[in-house]
Every structure is written in C-alpha cells, then in structure tokens.
C-alpha cells in the first residue's frame, strides 16, 4: 500500500535526505570603500545556496550644494557592491556580478516586494531610507540587504549541489566594495 505524504512531509524528507542546513560564517567588516572581503566556505556537507547579509553604516556630508535632501532609488542598497563572486578551485564561478545587476537578476526569481527596499522597517530583508537629509557635519545613513545566491538551478536540483566536504574543494566568496564616492548616486556638491 502506497503511503500518502503531505507537501510539508515531502519537503522535510527532502531536507533530511539532502542534508541541507544553515551554517554561519564569521562576521567581517570594512572600514573604507574600495576594500575586498573574502569568505571561505567550511568543508562540511553540501552547498546549494549562499546567503550574504550586508549591513552598511555610512556618513553622508553636505558640501557646496544648496540641496540638503536627496532621494534614494530601489537599487541604492545594492550599489555599494562593485563585484560579487563565488569562486571554486576547479575554475567555475557561478556568480561574477555587480550589486545592481544582481538585484535585477534576483527580481526575476524572487518577490520584488521583499527584494527592493522597504523604507519603514529596518529589520526587513532590504532597508534603505527614502530620503537622506545631510548636513555639513555629516548625517548617518543605515542600509541593509540580504543577497541570496543559489548555486543550483532550483531547490530540488541534486546535480548542481556542490560537495563542500571534499578536501579538494575550495569555495570562496569575494565581495568588492565600491569607493566612498561611488556608493551612492548623489548630485554635485555633496
């Protein structure tokens, strides 16, 4: 007699059979623009997806401009990433992309309402204030976003999963940040 499983039970069995789990990496910080961060994926289990959380705290200073307020757009939180890549030591790189292009690519796959900034909730998936009011002394700007980098075609694609526990496999995530002047699109005089 065949056993009837619910969708939730099938999903739980798939997660159990493929040994999917979340493994955190150490937090790293950048003190100035133009820097590069490198994360090495631990040699444990299988890799199907990488989540990268970027939390930015910037200081925006007003220069000679008469304007004291600038508006941000939907791609502002992603503009600070100049290059994002996942590199394997066999020469394959599933991602070599800049932040804005990644946001546009992800909008095809994900719900745009969670991908693009919410201006009210600082704890959401992506946050950026709608407007920045700057002074000559400087104004703090806080932005937050999460990059979801799938390595497989879909969640049920066992062929695309990378065997990270192999001693020969080396997986690195490299994040190149823009310089301070290119992190935001701002008018002259700022």
Predicted regions mapped to residue ranges:
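Short, low-complexity Pro/Thr/Gly
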Residues: 1-190
């Amino acid at each position: 007699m065949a056993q009837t499983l619910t969708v939730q039970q099938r999903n739980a069995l798939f997660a159990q059979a493929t040994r999917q789990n979340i493994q955190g990496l150490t937090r790293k910080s950048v003190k100035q623009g133009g820097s590069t961060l490198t994360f090495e994926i631990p040699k444990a289990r299988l890799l199907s997806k990488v989540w990268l959380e970027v939390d930015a705290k910037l200081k925006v200073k007003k220069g000679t401009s008469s304007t004291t307020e600038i508006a941000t757009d939907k791609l502002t939180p992603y503009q600070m990433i100049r290059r994002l890549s996942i590199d394997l030591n066999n020469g394959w790189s599933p991602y070599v992309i800049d932040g804005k292009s990644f946001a546009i690519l992800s909008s095809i796959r994900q719900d745009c309402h969670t991908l693009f900034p919410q201006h009210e909730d600082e704890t959401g998936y992506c946050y950026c204030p709608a407007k920045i009011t700057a002074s000559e002394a400087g104004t703090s700007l806080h932005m937050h976003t999460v990059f979801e980098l799938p390595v497989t075609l879909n969640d049920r694609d066992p062929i695309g999963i990378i065997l990270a526990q192999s001693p020969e496999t080396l997986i690195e995530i490299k994040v190149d940040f823009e310089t301070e002047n290119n992190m935001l699109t701002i008018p002259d005089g700022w």
